[in-house]
Amino acid sequence: MSDQDNTQTSSSKLAPHHNIFMANLESSPTKDRNTSSQNASSSRVIESLHDQIDMLTKTNLQLTTQSQNLLSKLELAQSKESKLLENLNLLKNENENLNSIFERKNKKLKELEKDYSELSNRYNEQKEKMDQLSKLAKNSSAIEQSCSEKLQNMEVNYNSLLESQNLYRDHYSDEISKLNEKIGLLELELSNQNLNYGSDTSSNSDIELNLNKFNDSVKDLKSLETEKDSKLSKIITHSLDELNLQSWLNLYQTNENLISTFAEKMDLKDVLKRNDEKISNKGAVVQTLKKNVQTQVESNNADALSSNNAQDMLPIKMVKLRKTPNTNDSSSNGNSSNNKRRSFYTASPLLSSGSIPKSASPVLPGVKRTASVRKPSSSSSKTNVTHNNDPSTSPTISVPPGVTRTVSSTHKKKGNSMVVHGAQS
């Protein structure tokens, strides 16, 4: 702006001086000289002066044109300079804006680099965790498989033992029915003998004594049944505690949680869907399993009690009843000799032997049996429960008369359980 003012002031000053110079040239005193003397001598001088004036005017015109050209160029240069200054100011502003943008971008880039480093560290940590979870999932799957195998073995053992107990129950129920029939026959014979030998008071007293002994033995059997019931309940609770079903359920729940976590980490939708279905049905499965275990334990307890009803019957001494010979009845001499040799309970082969065979004591799946032919394998020995040394609850299997020993087919498959099945000969 100052350069434009200078050019305007210089042009305004140049114009009046030029006009004054031209007026002075026109009002020169050389034109007013009219004397003749001077015209002759000074004509040359005048001409030379006129020539000089013309040259000066030409140079003045040239200078004016040059000055005007220079002024126009100066104006153009000043306008360009003003435009350049404006552009310079704009560029400075743009430069400042770009610098601020660059600083912001640089800060953002540093933040992104920091975030990238944090994300890379987190990625490495998550990768390590994923590797650990994969290893843990493999280990848990192996543990789950081993537990399922143990559970299958125990189920097979339990089923085989339950089958053997059912066979024992059927066998002893048949024996008891036979004994009841024989007792009924003996009661009929006793009533007949009482009618025939009503006069014999000594025989009646002996019969009453035997009946009292029999009643005492029945009471003893009831007390023994109550004791065995308590002992069986203790054995069942002890076996269930060592079976530790709740720990298996907790292990199953832990495995399901690990599988779901691993599937979420790996984004496995199919596995998550199947696992959610398993988790949704887990309560029903657990309740069904608990009910099955409870019913099996109760049935085992009932079978054990029914099979031990006639286990510890005391031998009863029989008193021979002798008939007083009747001299008037000659036809009964042959029968009297047979009646003299007949015992009161000689009709029962089991009672006449003096003792009743003991049945197999009830044991739960996995209980070590001393009557086993083979030694338990390493896989089944871990699940076996060591029984106590109480003789009344000893898990040894005794074979009653009329029962043959047969090895279950599960012994050949698994090699860790041998069950004696009863077969009536």
UniProtKB/Swiss-Prot annotation:
Keyword Transmembrane tagged: no
Coiled-coil boundaries: 68-197
Compositional bias annotation for Polar residues: 35-45, 345-358, 382-397
Compartments, as annotated in UniProt: Endoplasmic reticulum membrane
Keywords, ordered alphabetically: Coiled coil, Endoplasmic reticulum, Membrane, mRNA transport, Phosphoprotein, RNA-binding, Transport
Positions of region (Disordered): 24-45, 322-425
Annotated function: RNA-binding protein that binds specific mRNAs including the ASH1 mRNA, coding for a repressor of the HO endonuclease. Part of the mRNA localization machinery that restricts accumulation of certain proteins to the bud and in the daughter cell. Required for the delivery of cortical endoplasmic reticulum into the emerging bud.
Low complexity composition bias: residue spans: 326-338
Family of this protein: Belongs to the SHE3 family.
Organism of origin: Saccharomyces cerevisiae (strain ATCC 204508 / S288c)
Name assigned to this protein: SWI5-dependent HO expression protein 3
One Gene Ontology term from the biological process aspect of the record: endoplasmic reticulum inheritance
Miscellaneous: Present with 1010 molecules/cell in log phase SD medium.
Main location: endoplasmic reticulum
Membrane topology, from the record: Peripheral membrane protein
Gene name of the encoded protein: SHE3
